[in-house]
């Protein structure tokens, strides 16, 4: 009897140019959105944005769709979508957060302080992905990335290869930042 399935996990098949949907346009989501709009034209067809604050999504759509470099391929169009449309794309980016610790907090792991409330939010959208029979990538960008990926995987019934976290690069960069300040 085989205890472990050793078959490699394969990512969902994405089109040459993927439809990306992004939830929450706070500091993280809006920074990511700018990068995707400016640098993602070769792999992104369009970007759907959703935020609980309608005026925030409208502002970003207004600003970003007016950026057009003169001599390059067209940039991916940004459009405002309803929450029900978040899982109509190929790649879903979860940037939502109910709690961001103040920068003055110095004791304890601030990412874990975020976990309780953010877990509920990640679980909610994971269940929505399940209800929508979502077949694309569910990408977690909000902190703490690894525990939120686990919560999303458990709540969604998505395949493990569909849930991706983007946190190790941040942790490496944070370590490099503090190492550079250390002076030893």
Label each PLM-derived region with a short phrase.
Residues 1-59:
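NAD(P)+-binding Rossmann beta1-loop-alpha1 motif at the extreme N-terminus of oxidoreductases
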Residues 2, 46, 50-89:
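Conserved N-terminal Rossmann-fold NAD(P) cofactor-binding segment
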Residues 19, 166, 173-184:
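Substrate/ligand-engaging "lid" and interaction regions
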Residues 25-30, 53-55, 140-150, 167-172:
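Gly/Ser/Thr-rich loops at beta-strand to alpha-helix junctions
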Residues 38-42, 65-69, 85, 131, ...:
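Short, surface-exposed basic-aromatic patches at helix termini and helix-loop junctions that form
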Residues 73-135:
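Rossmann-like NAD(P)-binding element
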Residues 127, 131-154:
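Conserved Class I SAM-dependent methyltransferase catalytic core
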């Amino acid at each position: 009897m085989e205890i472990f399935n050793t078959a490699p996990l394969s990512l969902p098949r994405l089109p040459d140019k993927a439809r990306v949907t992004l939830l929450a346009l706070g500091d993280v989501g809006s920074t990511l959105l700018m990068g995707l709009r400016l640098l993602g034209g070769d792999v992104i067809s369009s970007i759907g944005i959703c935020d609980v604050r309608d005026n925030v999504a409208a502002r970003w759509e207004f600003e970003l769709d007016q950026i057009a470099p003169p001599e390059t391929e067209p940039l991916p169009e940004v459009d405002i979508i309803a929450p029900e449309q978040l899982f109509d794309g190929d790649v879903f980016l979860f940037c939502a957060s109910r709690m961001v610790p103040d920068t003055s907090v110095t004791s304890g792991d601030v990412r874990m302080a975020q976990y309780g409330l953010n877990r509920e939010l990640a679980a909610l959208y994971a269940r929505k992905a399940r209800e929508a029979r979502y077949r694309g990538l569910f990408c977690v960008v909000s902190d703490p990335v690894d525990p939120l990926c686990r919560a999303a995987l458990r709540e969604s019934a998505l395949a493990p290869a569909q849930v991706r976290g983007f946190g190790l690069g941040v942790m490496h960069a944070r370590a490099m930042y503090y190492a550079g300040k250390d002076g030893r």
